[in-house]
Amino acid sequence: MKSFMVFVLIFACFSCYYAQESTNFYCGRTLSRALAVLCYGAESKRDAGWWIPQHGHHALAGVRGKRGPVDECCEKACSIQELMTYC
């Protein structure tokens, strides 16, 4: 009985690990919704305005030449952990 419980525990650990590491393609509206949910905890409403804070838009001016979430998650699959690095 104990060996069965150890097997179940090990199987559960591996299942959780591989579930976290699964990758998907996120493009367009799916990408923006995923970032909104991951970064802000909920999908923003249309009337709430642009989801980037007013002081944050200047930080995006120097992004040219760097890989962004579209490069990382739309052109190739990425994990939730990779998506969260863009929060």
UniProtKB/Swiss-Prot annotation:
Q: What keywords were assigned to this record?
A: Amidation, Cleavage on pair of basic residues, Neuropeptide, Pyrrolidone carboxylic acid, Secreted, Signal
Coiled coil residues, start to end: none
Which cellular compartments is it found in? Secreted
- Show the propeptide residue ranges: 20-44, 68-87
Q: Where Arginine amide occurs along the chain?
A: 64
Q: Which GO terms describe its molecular function?
A: hormone activity
Q: Give the main localization category.
A: secreted
Quote the cellular component terms of the Gene Ontology held in the record.
extracellular region
Q: Which domain of life is it from?
A: Eukaryota
Gene Ontology annotations of biological process type: neuropeptide signaling pathway
Q: InterPro entries given for it?
A: Insulin-like (IPR016179), Insulin-like_sf (IPR036438), Insulin_CS (IPR022353), Insulin_family (IPR022352)
Transmembrane helix listed as a keyword: no
Q: Which residues form the signal peptide?
A: 1-19
Q: In which tissues is it expressed?
A: DAGWWIPQHGHHALAGVR-amide: Expressed in corpora cardiaca (CC), corpora allata (CA), antennal lobe (AL) and gnathal ganglion (GNG) (at protein level). Expression in CC and CA detected in most animals, in AL and GNG in few animals (at protein level).
What family does this belong to?
Belongs to the insulin family.
Q: What is this protein called?
A: Insulin-related peptide 1
Q: Which organism is it from?
A: Agrotis ipsilon (Black cutworm moth)
